[in-house]
Amino acid sequence: MRKLPLGLLPVLIFLAVFFAAPLLINLLESLRGPDGARGIAQFIRIFGDAYYLAVIGQTLLFGLVVTLACALMGYPLGYAVARAEGAFKIVLIFVVVTPLLVNVVVRSFGWLVILGGSGAINAAMRALGLPQLDLIYNWLGVGIAMVHVLLPFMALSVAGTLETLDRRVEDAARVLGAPPLRVFWHVTLPVSAQGLITGCILCFTLSIGSF
């Protein structure tokens, strides 16, 4: 049986004190009722109320949709980052992380300018003689903004795992006659699955927490 490296001990102590302990305290406090008695009556009341169940269901559905959108767009973006070289790779990484560098107020105002009734999209719709779209103050607008913020987490997670893939393995599969789709499905995707799963977990937890 392998022993735990002593170098991990400070990290584990830090996580226990500043992460695990507060979560445990919050859990214990959530069991305390108005009269000070502990029990699960509060949880029974919440999960027995249709309103709270609807809120929880909408939150989980929103998180799933945002995570799926991030996966569909973030995987190709992460693949491009992993395969890029030289100065183009640096530029591409900068473009990917830009949403995380912009202040939330500036970012929100930017989306209002783009998606609002007088924004660029609706201005183009009016110019084409098409009806105006309702893109803000609804699920769609929030989802678009959330995907914009969380996409870097997905792309960088995928790119990080693809960086570990030896391209000679893909080349060997092609030399043996495997078509590009088969190479991706049997070689590239399994290697990047860990990064994809990590990105999905990050996007899902952050999206439901923000929503």
Task: Cite the ranges covered by each PLM segment.
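Conserved acidic donor-binding loop of glycosyltransferase catalytic domains
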Residues: V183-F184
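Short coil/turn motifs that cap or connect alpha-helices
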Residues: P131, A178-P180
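The alpha-helix within a helix-turn-helix
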Residues: A173
